[in-house]
Amino acid sequence: MDTPRLHPETIAAVKERADIVDIVSEQVVLKKRGKDFVGLCPFHDDKSPSFTVSPAKQFYYCFSCGAGGNPIKFLMELGKQSFSEVVLDLAKRYQVPVRTLEVQQHQELQRQLSRRERLYEVLAVATQFYEQSLRRPEGAAALDYLRRSRQLQESTIQKFQLGYAPAQWASLATHLIEQKRFPADLVEEAGLVVARRNGQGYYDRFRDRLMIPIHDLQGRVVGFGGRTLTGEEPKYLNSPETTLFEKGKLLFGLDKARAAIAKQDQAVVVEGYFDVIALHAAGIDHAVASLGTALSRQQVKLLSRYSESNQIVLNFDADRAGAKAAERAIGEVEDLAYQGQVQLRVLNLPGGKDADEYLQRHSVADYRELLARSPLWLDWQIDQLLRDRNLDQADQFQAVVQAIVQLLGKLPNTPLRTHYVHQVAERLSQGEARTAVQLASDLRAQVRGQRWHGQASRWEKPGDVSIREQAEAQILKVYLHCPRLRLAVRKTLHDREIQGFSLQPHRLLWQAIAEIEEAHLGFAAMYQVERGEGNGDDLAAIDLVPILRDRLDQLTGVSLGGFLELSENDHADLTHPLPLLRGAVALVERLRCEKRCRHLLDSWARQSIHTFEHCIEQLLQAGIGEDVDAEAQITALHEQLNQEALHFQKLYYNERRYLQQLDQERCLNPQAFLGMTEHDATAIAPTTPQPISA
């Protein structure tokens, strides 16, 4: 039987999931050497380790026989298999769905590939048009802006192919469709023109804007960013998502920066196009920018191909908006950072300036010095938590401690946790040595109690995910379809310390909602809203459903059907939205609480319990004077020896009391909990250890 033609998406998915070390180590004994692995080459009679495997580059190479390639090539050469056979085997191994091409599908794919080439051609011609327009009289103001306001040299303008979109409604449309004879639907597909509502022709998407081409890794133009020159909103307008232009998979400037990233073993990620352009002009050419979105895991992995140490510096603005962008970026790759798979640092420039503004007033050496001193992401986050806090006020002190405990509880490395516990204790004690010692002890105990977060799935029952999915969906439906309750939802989540949603589709939808609201309300108002404060009327006035419907193509990985179009049952439930909301939130919190209980119960059960008899025996061996209060000494020793077990016992019973409180709230709205059985609601763990007592 012939091996079927595989769909390109299947091949791409296999390449993304296949790990070179995982595959090679099954055939070759590998030893760690620096960032790479070495072993005896399987392709020739190797006497000394000349075979190198690079996890960062997903590549192997033998310095003796010259064999080299990616994971697929390794298996093809070793097993003498065809490309398709290896890909099929890997697809089964990594559980990648296999799609194949029939003859007709193969022909359609060839047609699509041909159309892609035409799209590249259209975008290249558009780039030339914008570049030429910059040199014409109508582009004089844009050129003056680049030279005077941005202080760019001619070589930099040409390097980045900067241009100008004329103010006329259809200058580019006329040039491409009528003069260059490109099909109108092709030009529209490239994101350059928009069809008129009356169906009579097209108008230019970009008008009277400074044009910044966005390139892929091969240096081909795939989209544009257009900056207004008149104060018109939005300040920056990007190309829409197209076949070629996917914002989450691209980084502005990477085509020009990748060699420098490999040389410097570091990538600098900034916020704006002109930050990248200014840094490259100053000789700091290992800088890139995300395209108006938080840095994604995929973008981080893209950068990791070029940096052996996977070192990434986030250089975002030092204002609150920049800090929020940095926090979003950290959130996307936090697990990679905790595991040490990426060395993440954060650089905030003084005075709240971006890189472009800073370089206009300071030297390149100043910037490089700040770059070299940029703190690790965890140090930066701790700094953010302590900034502008009055630690003499109990509520602020408690809030800081709780947030820091959550951060440190996720660290898998015990020595590193100890380092940060002592460092934070020193800062919280404000120079008081005795207080620092006590704080370090308290923090260590609290962090130990938080360690279950890193192993969440271990403490989760099989049915928890589906129950949580129902509850989170109900919260989102209330938020979307009951606008008067939006501030109440925000306040409830904030007060319960529920940081967003657990399931990825819900997180993406919540993030999209927040971006829409921030665009309407502004950052300052949105900051209050996220804390459950501010004006609920302004929040309620935003018509989220149609806006989200228009953004369907941008929300990959989210099925919005059940959120935007309500069923009859949904309509019935939402006739009493407030009890529904309270019940759903209580259920989300209950699931978290149950998980904590299971963890604490397990930790408690694993402690060695020392009896009073054991304590008496120890004291007798040590010798007790006649004038000593023996009962007090026995009690003190009992508490000392059982300190850990008593700690977990106390935490466990606190959680059980909280569960009872949540169950009372749950009774307000039974229909929010139809997915929860009586057993789910009561069974926390098989057996509760006996309390430690006399």
From Swiss-Prot:
Biological process GO terms, please?
DNA replication, synthesis of primer
SUPFAM superfamilies in the cross-refs: DNA primase core (SSF56731), Zinc beta-ribbon (SSF57783)
* Co-factor binding comment: Binds 1 zinc ion per monomer. Binds two Mg(2+) per subunit.
Q: Which cofactors does this protein require? A: Zn(2+); Mg(2+)
Annotated residues for binding of Mg(2+) 2: D317, D319
The protein's Enzyme Commission number: 2.7.7.101
This entry's Gene Ontology molecular function terms read:
DNA binding; DNA-directed RNA polymerase activity; zinc ion binding
One Gene Ontology CC term in the entry: DNA-directed RNA polymerase complex
Instruction: Report domain Toprim positions.
Output: 265-348
The zinc fingers classed as CHC2-type run over 41-65
User: Which UniProt key words apply to this protein?
Assistant: DNA replication, DNA-binding, DNA-directed RNA polymerase, Magnesium, Metal-binding, Nucleotidyltransferase, Primosome, Transcription, Transferase, Zinc, Zinc-finger
Q: Which domain of life is it from?
A: Bacteria
Q: Which reaction does it catalyse?
A: ssDNA + n NTP = ssDNA/pppN(pN)n-1 hybrid + (n-1) diphosphate
Transferase as UniProt keyword: yes
Q: Which InterPro entries match?
A: DNA_primase_core_N_sf (IPR037068), DNA_primase_DnaB-bd (IPR019475), DNA_primase_DnaG (IPR006295), DNA_primase_Znf_CHC2 (IPR036977), DnaG_bac (IPR030846), DNAG_N (IPR013264), DnaG_primase (IPR050219), TOPRIM_DnaG_bac (IPR034151)
Free-text note regarding domains: Contains an N-terminal zinc-binding domain, a central core domain that contains the primase activity, and a C-terminal DnaB-binding domain.
Name of the molecule in the record: DNA primase
